[in-house]
Amino acid sequence: LPDDGLRVLVSGPRVPATLVSIPAYPSDAPHPDEPTPALELTDVGLALVAITNDLRGRAALIQRGQNNFSQKLEFAAAAGAGFAVVRNNQGGTERLYMGGAETQFTPIPAVFIDQTSGQALSEYLRQNSGVTARLSLQKAIARLTVTNTLQVDHVRLRARFAHARRADVRLTLVSPAGTRSVLHHHNSDTSSPLGEWDFHSVRHLLESSAGEWT
């Protein structure tokens, strides 16, 4: 299975090798389970106040610090950004998970990258125009075809993991109708393995069971 698979993919003139595919942590904002469009990336600094730039058709690079994540992301979304990349302001290669109830109401995908990558990306944007980025998740897909046609009440999925950090694991289930259940997501528990679990979802209520589940 891919590990550390959430990436910011950068395209532009002579992109440094260290910026082509930047590892990122997700947030409690919408998760890019499918790749986002490649959008021109704009550095908006700290985003302490409402952003006056028109970010429609663009993505925002935001520096951590002084105000909370949810406010920064709200400003980016209000300016029209398609997604946001928040860069750390300390810690070198350290990354944080942008969690919390307020962040869950952010309408755009948002990820967090480390200070070293973020500073290099900001400098690259300063020196080059037309730089684009997209969010992409490296993932393994298992397919299960159900031939019985039943009306779904709830779904149970048993999964077994061999991974030392449950914090890293994201597990989703997509029905033939296209409804996605998030069964396990990134979290702050970095000290224990996930092992084997039964996951339950009622998001597929009244859907047909027949077809391919992934």
Predicted regions and their residues:
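Structured lumen-facing ectodomains of secretory-pathway proteins
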Residues: 1-146
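Loop and turn regions of beta-sandwich accessory domains that flank beta-strands and are enriched
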Residues: 1-2, 138-214
